[in-house]
Amino acid sequence: MPTDPDSRLRGNDEAILLAEGQKSAVTEYYLNNGEWPKDNTSAGVASASDIKGKYVKSVTVAKGVVTAQMKPDGVNNEIQDKRLSLWAKRENGSVKWFCGQPVTRNANDDAVTADGNNKIDTKHLPSTCRDTSSAGK
């Protein structure tokens, strides 16, 4: 099992890269439909279990929030089975993305709420992925 810091960062980097790969589809869906896609299918991306990697178990789209779930084993203890999210908010006619702890969104709200379950401790997140659920308010 990887225990060195580089392995931990690779896991986080992979999670962010796989999640970021869904951003354009989520953004396009929102711009075309005026609402956030409710799931992977409506966003036009692969199923959550098909978006995976060496360290990432799945990537889920839920109401426009993209959440990467780390694998329960084969990754550093600090991130085993933990999650991080990317989410967008409307801003001046466009869409601005944020990255950080896992969040959820109700229906077509712009606001997101922190989802404290299985979150990666902030100190283990890359500096570019430390937005809070209140970002952009």
Model-predicted regions and their roles:
Residues 31-137:
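Periplasmic/extracellular, small/polar-rich flexible segments of pilin-like filament-forming proteins
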Residues 6, 10-47:
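Conserved hydrophobic/amphipathic alpha-helical signal-anchor segments
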